[in-house]
Amino acid sequence: SDYCGTGAQDVLSLSWDASRGAFSVMGNLLAGVGIVGQPGAKNVYGLVLQPVYRISPHLEGVFQYQCSFGNRSVKLNTRYVPSVTHYPAWVDSMHSFYLGLNCYLCPEAVNAVKLMLAVEYVTSRVDSTTAKAFNGWSVFGAVRFKF
């Protein structure tokens, strides 16, 4: 199947947002129960923390930390595990650190046009003495706009 979600039968997500002045933060706790399609996998748990600082009306700095845990229950994004590698797509733990800069071309309508530039470091583990897991850097550039 081409299912790209967590692979869990049931998922619970608790999110929290807060802001004060130029600073805002988002947090999300996740739990997925009953992983399907991966032998030996049961449950997956995760956390996302994303503080954002508005530098100016046009610029915003973003940091994001993500972690996920579960016995062979964490499914890595396909951009980390392309078909030409020998890294497993399912791991026991994953941590990612994202640092980005957003540029709003129309700050009075922030969803109109946004330029994004970021770097991300991902480290993952498989609790096995023979298996290696993905650890590496990604560089992102994007243009987002809304009609």
Question: Model segments located where?
Answer:
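Outer-membrane beta-barrel pore domains
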Residues: 2-147
